[in-house]
Amino acid sequence: MTKMISLEEARELVLSRVTPLEAETVDLLDAAGRVAAADLKSDIDVSPFAHAAMDGYAVRRCDLAGATAESPITLEVIDEVPAGGVFEGTPQAGQCVRIMTGAALPGCFDAVVKYEIVSMVEGDGKPGGRVAFSAQPKERDNVREAGEEARAGEIVVNKGEVITTAGVGFLAGCGVLRVPVYR
């Protein structure tokens, strides 16, 4: 009669007869479909800066304290920041900046109000115009913080995971250029 062994004993028996695959380091673009031979960590914070999570207006919450639908607060639009752009100015009280998704959030602002919920008062919402806000946004509303997707040193692909084409793109965004994979 055959003797039964425990699952742990069976596992140890199988593993004792397996030769681990060797690892090699390859260029990131050659890693798609390969298995990570080590935990892969981000080299940088992704995103490296706080940025607008959607199109809208970068505001200082203090400028909109007390804003309601019955008593909206109007701000002057002083600039427009495109995706990937940076605002270089210094706004005064009562001013805001039109900002696009992905643009760096100027440090003087603490929230982004969606374009769709703002009323145009003068102009078309672009620099030189005025827009009305019917509520004070929450702190950091519609803002993606620096490092929100990955922090420098954070594991972004675990050892033993298959590196997908999407994973290659994400690793590239994390500053990873070469990766250890199994042969």
Regions found by a protein language model. Give the residues of each.
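Short, low-complexity N-terminal leaders and the immediately following helix N-cap/first helix
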Residues: 1-71, 98
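Short, glycine/charged-enriched hinge/interface segments at domain edges or termini
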Residues: 2, 7, 58-183
